UniProtKB/Swiss-Prot annotation:
Its EC number is 2.1.3.15. The gene is accA. It comes from Chlamydia trachomatis serovar D (strain ATCC VR-885 / DSM 19411 / UW-3/Cx). One of its GO terms (biological process) is fatty acid biosynthetic process. This is Acetyl-coenzyme A carboxylase carboxyl transferase subunit alpha. Acetyl-CoA carboxylase is a heterohexamer composed of biotin carboxyl carrier protein (AccB), biotin carboxylase (AccC) and two subunits each of ACCase subunit alpha (AccA) and ACCase subunit beta (AccD). Component of the acetyl coenzyme A carboxylase (ACC) complex. First, biotin carboxylase catalyzes the carboxylation of biotin on its carrier protein (BCCP) and then the CO(2) group is transferred by the carboxyltransferase to acetyl-CoA to form malonyl-CoA.
Amino acid sequence: MELLPHEKQVVEYEKTIAEFKEKNKENSLLSSSEIQKLDKRLDRLKEKIYSDLTPWERVQICRHPSRPRTVNYIEGMCEEFVELCGDRTFRDDPAVVGGFAKIQGQRFMLIGQEKGCDTKSRMHRNFGMLCPEGFRKALRLAKMAEKFGLPIIFLVDTPGAFPGLTAEERGQGWAIATNLFELARLATPIIVIVIGEGCSGGALGMAIGDVVAMLEHSYYSVISPEGCASILWKDPKKNSDAAAMLKMHGEDLKGFAIVDAVIKEPIGGAHHNPAATYRSVQEYVLQEWLKLKDLPVEELLEKRYQKFRTIGLYETSSESDSEA
């Protein structure tokens, strides 16, 4: 597994403890209580390091090559999954994976953005950057879910919509705008979870829902830290400053009422214990579905509308308040 800079100290300590334990089998250098003390010290070290991460270090965790992706969540959470392909207009976009899913006996339409796991699959998936047909495919499946009365799960993980000329020629902006318009009035529960990167319109085009949650080390932002640094300071090396200023992680966004919940990850990030992460996401999905499933459609849509309508609302005191 690829090591991030802040993980090196932990890995070195783990190696040292493993060597002690191996030698201890032959020579009994340490008692069992002393070994337990070493393990506890390791746990404390992990807690100290991972509770004091900078925003940029959390971005690095979010981008870790071994971080679980949409296809991994499908394998880890679903008892059944039937993939559906194509936008019925141009072609299938491999950057979107979607289909009928069964989780704990309940049927959903699960639609996620997929980056790929190695060079070949990343090229095939276009690194998770959706073309217009990807957004149209997602909307087609969402409308199918509405038709069959299925709740929808959106898994967001993209560095942004594909900015290429061909995508623009095929109506990239139009496709994203259409998704925002249509998903806002779709008459079925929608649960959105940002599992990795959630960048710009590429994320927003699949992030309109009744509840929006984020994994602890995922991020959701109008732009990547590197992009922000290039624009503001003309220096992409200021990415750590940009990551801090963008307030792109769950605790900040929850405070701004942009997301509703932050799902805890295992210590070190989702890639350290994918199975535990799948369980946490599955529990959250089922818990939220139980809250949404019996709401009248009119109430569901009104709450969804108001949720997004009030994002970014800025209020000033009235003249009477200031005089008082």
